[in-house]
UniProtKB/Swiss-Prot annotation:
Subunit structure, as described in the record: Interacts with the RNAP. Has a higher affinity for the core RNAP than for the holoenzyme. Its ATPase activity is stimulated by binding to RNAP.
Gene Ontology biological process terms from the UniProt entry: regulation of DNA-templated transcription
PROSITE patterns recorded: HELICASE_ATP_BIND_1, HELICASE_CTER
SUPFAM superfamilies registered for this protein in UniProt: P-loop containing nucleoside triphosphate hydrolases (SSF52540)
Binding-site positions, ATP: 176-183
Annotated gene: rapA
Annotated Pfam families: Helicase_C (PF00271), RapA_C (PF12137), SNF2-rel_dom (PF00176), Tudor_1_RapA (PF18339), Tudor_RapA (PF18337)
Family label: Belongs to the SNF2/RAD54 helicase family. RapA subfamily.
Protein name, entry field: RNA polymerase-associated protein RapA
Classification lineage: Bacteria, Pseudomonadati, Pseudomonadota, Gammaproteobacteria, Aeromonadales
Amino acid sequence: MPFALGQRWISDTETDLGLGTVVAVEGRMVTLLFPATGENRMYAKEEAPVTRVSFNVGDQIASHEDWTMTVEEVQEKDGLLIYVGVRTDNDEPVALKEVFLNNFIKFNKPQDRLFAGQIDRMSRFTLRYEALINQHQRRRNPTRGLAGGRVSLIPHQLYIAHEVGHRYAPRVLLADEVGLGKTIEAGMIIHQQLLSGRAHRVLILLPETLQHQWLVEMLRRFNLHFSLFDEERCIEAFADAENPFETEQLVICSLDFLRKKRRRFEQVLEAEWDLLVVDEAHHLEWSEEAPSRAYEMVEALAEQVPGVLLLTATPDQLGHQSHFARLRLLDPERFYDYDAFLAEEQAYGQVASAAQELLDGETLSDEAKRILASQLEGLDLSDAAARQQAVAKLLDQHGTGRVLFRNSRANIQGFPERHLNVYPMPLPEQYKTAIKVMGMMGGNGGDLQTRALRYLYPEKIFQQFEGDNATWTQFDPRVEWLLELLLSARQQKVLVICSEAATAIALEEALRTREGIRGAVFHEGMSILERDKASAYFAQQEGGAQVLLCSEIGSEGRNFQFASHLVLFDLPLNPDLLEQRIGRLDRIGQQNTVEIHVPYLEGTSQRALQLWYHDGLDAFEQTCPTARPVFEAVRDELFELLAANTGDQAPLDALLVKTRELHEPLKARLEQGRDRLLEIHSSGGAAAQQLVDKLAAEDDDTGMISFALKMFDEIGVNQDDRGENALVLTPGDHMLVSSFPGLPQDGMTITFDRNTALSRDDMALLSWDHPMMRGGIDLILGSEIGATSVALLKNKALPIGSILLELIFVAESAAHPQLYRFMPPTPIRLLMDKNGQNLGEKVAFDAFNRQLTPVNRHLGSKLVTASQPVIHGLIGKGQAIAEELKGGIVDKARAQMAQTLQQDLDRLEALKAVNPNVRDSELDYLRNLQAELHHLIDQTQLKLDAIRFIVVTHN
C-alpha cells in the first residue's frame, strides 16, 4: 500500500474513529492520527486494516471549516488528492486538499460506505433486505393492528374492530352484552387507529373504579402506554407545559374528577384529541330540559374530537330516551329530534320484523313482502342466495347499523355452561359472639349500604374486636371446606375470589401452613409486575399454583379460562361485580362447564344474598342483563333485609317474589326487543370468520419467528429458551446499539404462541405489530446496518474473477400513514452483471444468497478498491433500470388507490341516499384523501438503500 503524509484513510475495524490522517511512515510501519477522537494507531504497512478515502465527481464533501462543495474534478499531486469544484453556499470555485477534509465525515450512502471500506457482514445485508420486504408487506396488510393484541381470535370482536378501526374518525356506540369484550373491541380499534396514523392523541374517560383496569388492559393486551391523570399528575405535569394534558399522547381520566375540577375540564377541552373513548356511557343521564353535567361535558368534547367511541352494555335498558341521547352525542345533526327518532324506530321495527321472516326462511307474509319491496328495488327472493343478498342490502341500509354495534350471548357461539354448587354451613359461635358484642356497643350505625355490607363479612366484625391478627381462619367452616375441596381436586386449577385483599392473604397462609397447598395471592396492593408473576405461577401446568386467591379489585380485567372451578368465598353486593367475578372464567374459549362454588353461613345475610341472586335473578347460571335495573328497583328492600341479618324467611320470600315479578317480564321484553338484523350486522357473519382464518394463518406463519430470531442474533440480544414456548430476551454486552427498542434493561419473557400468551400475563406476545418488532425494523432501516456487503460466489460455470453487483433500491414517498396501503416503501432488487444486464428477476434472492460465501472486511475492501470504476458504472446503469421499474410500481399504486377509494366513495354515496347515518365529513375526507394521495404517489422518489459486491471464484 503506497502511504504518503497527509493522506486520509479510515479504519476498517474502528469506524467510529472518523477520518484518519497519515502522520508518519517509517520502515514497515505507518502511523495514523484520528483528529475526531485525538487517538493514534500504528499499523504494519502490508496488513494495515484501513481503506483510502477518495471521493468522486458529483459527490458532496465537507471541509474542516464546515462548508460543503460539489466535486467536479479530482487531481492527484505527490500522492495526495485535491478536490476541485464549487461551494454549495455561494457557488464560488474552490480546490480542497484532502488533508483539510472534515474529520467527522460520515458515509451515509451505501456506495460511499462501500468505497470507504465500511463493509458489513453478509448476514446483516440479508437481514436488512428481509426487513425491507417485511415492512413493505406489513404496511400493506389490511389486518395491521388487529393481529398484535394479546386477544383470542373471536369473530365478532375482530369484525367490529376491523369495520370501525378502518374508518376515518369513527363515531360509534359499542353495546355488546356483558362479557362479550367491548373493552377489547375498543382496544383493537384504538390500536389500529394509532398504527395507521388515523389517530395520534387518545383520551379515555371512565368511572374512577375502572381506571386501573383499563390501564392494565391497554398495556398488557395492546402494549399501549396510557397515562392516568388525576390532580396530582396535573400539578406534576404543569412544570413541563401550561396545559398538563398536552404532555402525553394517550390519557386515561376519571369523568368524576373532571366534573369536580372545572379548570381541568377546560384544559382537557383545549387539548386537541383525535379519538375520545367513554366507558359506562349509560351513566350519562339526559333529558331535553335538564341534561346532566357529565353528559354536557362529554357532549362538549364530542363536538370537538373527530372520533368518538361510546361503550355501554345497556343500549336500551334504561329507556329509549337515554339511548337516543347517546346516539345524539355521536351525530347531533342526524339525531336531532326525539319524536322523529321514535317514528323512525317504529318504521324500522316493521322492517326488522320482515327481515326476521326472511332470516327464518319461512314463506313471507304479504305485509313482509310489501315492506321489503318498499325497501329494496327489484326484490328477488327466488332462492336462499337471493334471500341472503336481500338481507345484506338491508344491513347496509340499517337504521343505526353504522353507528351501533350490539351482540348478545344468544347470537354468539362458544360460551360454556355454568353450574352452581351451594354449601350451607353453621355460623360459628365466635362470630355470633362478635356480632352480639357489636350490637351491644352500638356498632350497628352507618348508612343503609354500610349496614348491609357489614354482615356479609363476619370475619371483619370478629377482627374488629380481636385485632387484625385474629386467626378467624382456624374456626371459620368455609376454610375447612375449601381445604377439602382443593385436596379432593388436586389436578384442578381453582380460582377463589373474595371482597377484601386481607381475606385472600389470610386464606393463602391457612392453606399453605395447614396442608402445604401451593397457592398465590392476587390483590390491589401488589404491583402489576407482582400480579403478573402470581398469574403466571397459577397458569403454570408443571409445578404451578393449584389455587389463586383474588381480591375483588385485584381480579379486574384478568381472564383465567384455563381454570373451570370458581369459589366465591363471599358475595359482592353489586350484581355487576358478581358477573365480573364469574366472567374471569366464563369466556369464549372456556373448554369446560364453569363450576361455581358458593359456601355461606346459615341464618345470616349471606344466605339471603345467595338466594336473591339465584332464585330472584338466576344470576349464577345465566348472564343477567336485567340485573342492574332490577337491583336499582329493589335496592332499599334488599339492603334492609341484609342489614337486619335475622335469617327470617318471610321478608326474604316477599323480596324474591317482587324480584322475579320485575325480572321475568323485563327479560322477556329484552328478548322480544332483540334486533336480529342489528345482531347479524354486528356479529359479522362470514366476513368475521374470514378475518379469523386470515389471522390464524398469520399466527401459523413461521417467517416472523425466523426473522425475529435472526434480528436478535445480529443486533446482539441474548436469547434464553425456557421451554413452554417461552424465550427470555436480555440486552447483550456487545449489542450494535446501546438499547434495543422496547426491551427493558432487566429483560423480557416473550412467546410467539397466542394461546401461551393468553394464559401467561408475564409473557409478551411477539407479533409484527409488537413495538419490539416495529422498533427493531425501524432500527435496522434507520441505520447503516447491512447497507454494504462483499461476498464470493463459487461457480465454475462463470469465469473466475467475474463480478456481480446486487443493488437494493427503495421507492418511497412522503411518510403518510394512509399512503402505506397503496404505496409503502417498496424495495426494488437488481442483480447487475459486468455488462449492466439485470439478472434480478431470473435469480431469486434466497437461492442466490445460499450460494454465497462471506469475506472479511479487509479482503472485501481490497476487492472493492480494485473494481471501483466498474462498480461506479454499474450503479449508474442500475439507477436507470430502477427508475423504469419504479414507474410501473407507481402506476399500479395510483390505479389501486383510485379504484379502492372510488369504490368506498361510491358505496358511501349510495348508502347516504338510503341511510342518513353516513356523515358528510366521511365523504369529504375520502375525496380530499384521494387528491392528496394522488399527489404523494406522483412524488415517489428512488434511493439506493444497500449494495452487495460479489466476485466469482472457483475455490
